[in-house]
Amino acid sequence: PGTVIISAAGNCNNINQVVEPVLQKDGGEIYYINLSKDGHKLGGSSFAQILNGIGDEAPSVLDAGYFKTVFNTLQKLIKDGQLLAGHDVASGGLITTLLELCFADNDLGANLDLSSLNEQDTIKLLFSENIGVVFQAKDDSAENELKASGIEFAKIGSPSSESTLKIKNNGIEIGLNIASLRDTWFKTSYLLDNKQTANGLAKNRFDNYKNQQLNYIFPENFDGQLSPRAQSRGNDRPKAAILREKGSNSEREMANAMYLAGFDVKDVHMTDLITGRETLEDIQFIGAVGGFSNSDVLGSAKGWAGAFKYNEKANKALQDFFARPDTLSVGICNGCQLFMELDLINPEHGTHGRMTYNDSHKHESGFTSVKIQKNDSVMLSTLEGATLGVWISHGEGKFELPLSEKEYNIVAKYGYDAYPANPNGSSYNTAMMTDKTGRHLVTMPHIERSIFQWNWANYPKGRKDEVSPWIEAFENARKWIEKH
């Protein structure tokens, strides 16, 4: 039979004005709003499901107009910077929301009194799935806006620096250990992960997820502002080119990073090189992009590399480019695999390193950190000593390096050498390398997808940066070219 499908989308006016589902230890009070205006009913809830039941009554939204008013008022409070954290009440009920607000940090809990919600049955109160919201306000001034809009709310408690969720309700007191329940919460993901992940690494993820904290060290002189060159429209921009193949992606992110750093960026497809329409003779900086060129048939970047090796014009254009002393390149993800497959990073080695399958034997996608080593890389020189967050997304991201570490110019390593922070098991914990001149960089982490503060899954609290430190890699390339 025909099926009616109704889709809805919500517009986010400003992605820089959002609240995250994690309480701020130094923030204000915690509030609850029941958007449903219905009683606390357990029908259709996760609680009913684990008891092998369905229930008789499920909560509904009794007043659509009130729901709209609450939503719009909360949007205004977010826009005005009055809310520090927030989480909807949905699957699992209020207790799940409260716990999840504490899971994403260490030494974080809350002291709560739910008696003002006027529900004697604590089980119903905690596990009913009435649509609602829990939020943390910057200060008490948010209450004035809520009252002015006729919204019923309850101040239910405050955050704490103890890893315990303490709940009171009409004489009942409950203390819940955050770390223990976070493991319980994560266990379902672990059980599914264990069916997909090789070499017992699902257990490593389960053991390490709470230990591999994202700790950053930003460059001392980084101010978070775009270079004036980003706004220039003159003809003095050095020329850069994006290299891509069928199945490539991230070319727009790479082009944008180059442009913001001051480059005039050209799009170059493999057909341009194969036919001779493009020779790269007027290009000083190339970026081979990420993705799944040729659908990874025969392996990542194998087909792309073959297109260079077995097409005379394309091969000559690339070899001539790398032979010039005034050029730079960056290969990111699939582009890294391409340059490694073509032996462009360590051509002097008799036995070459290669990219191979992740130790997990599956595609890895996540947000991790890298430590920039002491280096002579053109692109990363000013980032030496920094530890930065970055996205990874690859199935064959393992640097398999047959020689001793001193034979390679490893310029960045993952923040931790264990899985999942090191997502692939690379030799020497390698995340990025350059050739011996420092001019040609290969990186499995996607620095071009991590250019903006809002790109990062986690960013240092309190910073209001236009761009992240990764923009310096591209700016350094432009400055070097202007001198050469």
Region spans (language model):
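Proline-centered loop/turn at the N-terminus of a beta-strand
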Residues: E152, D326-L328, R439
